[in-house]
Amino acid sequence: MAEAEEDCHSEAVREGDDDDENESPAETDLQAQLQRFRAQWMFELAPGGGSGNLESRPCRAARGSLLRAADTRGKQELAKEEKARELFLKAVEEEQNGALYEAIKFYRRAMQLVPDIEFKITYTRSPDGDGVGNSYIEDTDDDSKMADLLSYFQQQLTFQESVLKLCQPELESSQTHISALPMEVLMYVFRWVVSSDLDLRSLEQLSQVCRGFYICARDPEIWRLACLKVWGRSCIKLVPYTSWREMFLERPRVRFDGVYISKTTYIRQGEQSLDGFYRAWHQVEYYRYVRFFPDGHVMMLTTPEEPQSIVPRLRTRNTRTDAILLGHYRLSQDTDNQTKVFAVITKKKEEKALDHKYRYFRRAPVQEADQNFHVGLQLCSSGHQSFNKLIWIHHSCHITYKSTGETAVTAFEIDKMYTPLLFARVRSYTAFSERPL
């Protein structure tokens, strides 16, 4: 093809020379050079253009060497990633077999080759080492879309062995493992975890240990007992909830693993100075603390002391704080679907020592009276937390005279001085259990 093009160009040159025979020699020579340049240029453009491609061969050689180097680097990266993948899977297998030191070595070697190898592996077998079962997973997407984890975990444990075991020891030990306990004993341990303080938060954390513990933590009897302890006979029926756990989590209730706190600040005018040119103003701050207990008891304290010093004293009802108010509370849900908390509290009785100095003197009779306070609070949720806010709706003082039986009631106006109480969780309140659920 190149030779045909060259012949065509040669004929064109000859025809041009025949037509320009009458031109001057200088113009003829210039025209001949131009035709030769065109012919050489077309020849170099043609594939396999002979000696004309000698100048472009170094470029093509450099380009080819770059492509070969890139291909080599790509193959090396693939080989390195495959080696890291094998080491990582070997580490997972060693970890499941209990050889932790060997597993760490393989993990280190794999991540030295490819730091993010963990995210580049598609597992065909579950890599978790919780000892519940090495169940094979056909599709990760289907596993993530399962809504009912409880039935799924029960199915996995059923397929694992003929004898149902909630968990298996990860490491061999001469001591008796918790998996050897019967189901009844293990459930009793879980009731101790919840305790009489209704620490369901610890139960949820315990369910994250393994699949077997997840099944135990979802036992309906535990959640039913917790609901009965909070609402009593008013929660005999599940409607409109689908489970006891759903009722406990979604139905409005007061919280027991902390204390509700409010802070009130106001400005008070001081006494005028002697010269009459200066009058002091005082900023007054005080706190209200309300602590609820699952058995229906409540504590309330109004004091200027900050939470750092007061909160530890409210852990139990046997506090030595003199100004503490003790009583009972109940939950009430009106027709407007607003849950309210009503409490009757009174000051802790103090035992007065007998004064022997004046025992022979006749004293004027003192009219004895019982004083208690009636409190009404509306339970609300704010932010991302549930049932963490109490709004004042009622506060009154009732004084009953024992001699006449009459009761004097003084109602206080709910103004801006009654700031809402916000819940603060206290870890020490659920640090240990005194009685099981």
Curated annotation (Swiss-Prot):
What SUPFAM superfamilies is this protein classified in? Answer: F-box domain, MIT domain
Name the GO cellular-component terms.
Answer: cytoplasm; SCF ubiquitin ligase complex
GO terms, biological process? protein ubiquitination; regulation of TOR signaling; SCF-dependent proteasomal ubiquitin-dependent protein catabolic process
**Record's PROSITE patterns?**
FBOX
The stretches annotated as TPR repeats are 84-117
Q: Would the keyword Cytoplasm be found if you checked this record's keyword annotation? A: yes
Q: Which domain of life is it from?
A: Eukaryota
Enumerate composition-biased segments (Acidic residues): 16-26
Q: In which pathway does it act?
A: Protein modification; protein ubiquitination
Q: What does this protein do?
A: Substrate recognition component of a SCF (SKP1-CUL1-F-box protein) E3 ubiquitin-protein ligase complex which mediates the ubiquitination and subsequent proteasomal degradation of target proteins and plays a role in several biological processes such as cell cycle, cell proliferation, or maintenance of chromosome stability. Ubiquitinates mTORC1-bound TTI1 and TELO2 when they are phosphorylated by CK2 following growth factor deprivation, leading to their degradation. In contrast, does not mediate ubiquitination of TTI1 and TELO2 when they are part of the mTORC2 complex.
Q: What is this protein called?
A: F-box only protein 9
User: To which species is this protein native?
Assistant: Bos taurus (Bovine)
